[in-house]
Amino acid sequence: MNADLAQRIESFLASQHVMSLATWGPDGPHATNLFFACDGLKLIWVSDPDSRHSLQIEADPRVAATVAPDCSDFSAIRGVQLNGTAKRVTAADERVRHLGRLEARYAFLRQLADGPTKLREAYARTAVYKLQPAAIILIDNSQGFGHKEMLKIDA
């Protein structure tokens, strides 16, 4: 694995907060926007296990995702495209570790403990998910129109 490219991807991901996750199910493709945190190059998030994307991950773990800031100048386009597999984190120690990453990144998650009952209950029902990328493409038009670098991840 190209360590320099991996580091640039990690730095970019750390500067962003929303990914668009694409899943597949009986009704076709589905995309959803999610807050995320990183564990190296793995993306972590929480979701209702009964949400459409969560159910689709349980049925078929193959996913794709993009992370990109909004911009109006094509030369400023930067982002990543990922494909790999997603799964629900079931090991208690791993779940606690990943929740810690998310709560460290997003203050509103820490504040839910003192928030309204409905929000606390909804958060308590969430499941932790992890995307293990197989490949990541870093896009950076500041390096030239359509500039892309691919990082293959060894399983």
What are these regions (language model features)?
Residues D48-S51, A64-P69, R105-T117:
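Short acidic (Asp/Glu) patches
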Residues S51-H53, S72, G144-G146:
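Short, surface-exposed beta-strand-loop junctions and turns on beta-sheet-rich folds
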Residues S15-S20, L109-A113:
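Short Pro/Gly-enriched beta-strand edge/turn motifs at strand-loop
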Residues R78-A155:
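Charged, gly/pro-rich active-site loop segments
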Residues Q16-P49, L55, A64-P69, I77-Q81:
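Short beta-strand segments
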